[in-house]
Amino acid sequence: MSEEQGRGDGGLRPISGRMAVEERRAPGGALLEPWDGVWPSVDPSAWCHRSAVIIGDVVVEAGASVWPTVVLRGDQGSLRVGAESSIQDGAVLHATRGLSHTVVGARVTVGHRAILHGCIIEDDVLIGMGAIVLDGAVVERHCVIGAGAVVGAGKRIPAGSMVMGVPGRVVRALRPEEIAAWIAHGHEEYLRLTRLLLGEAAGAALGEPGP
């Protein structure tokens, strides 16, 4: 088969005697890779940095952002990143086959190098830098999981809680002004950055300077 014939077959091309998968990229440049025939789905209004890795059964919803070196690996269970959520540098989302999926709700901030494995994070939550949330855990809305905290498998964190430590424990309830300052402000700032980057990308595609 010639190289030209390969390109005509659904975008596939031969490499070293085998057929390579067509290349798909998310807004922002992240390479999307299929797993067992399932491709990631990224909303056109989301932004995913070109160094992020997004594999398999992954959904990234409108306005969400995925930052440098993030890994979203949907090979063992499905992953969903909710609308206007940010997955920050070096974070990893994964699951356990036959046991769990990972769901991140809307307007969630997942800090640098955090790990979410087979858990559910409800809307309007802040996951601190380096925090870990394990299989079957549920973090209800308006929670802050402190930097480096570990939420154990199967644990449920009540709405409006501050969690700290290893193992993670609820240390107190959050005040309304803390929810506004830590959770809402973080969401708004990363949404602003996402829209800025999407605007720059659109301008570059048209040959225009960014904002």
Where do the language-model regions lie?
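Glycine-rich hexapeptide-repeat left-handed beta-helix
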Residues: S2-S41, D75, V81-E84, D89-T96, ...
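N-terminal segments that cap or nucleate solenoid repeat domains
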Residues: E22, A26-V66
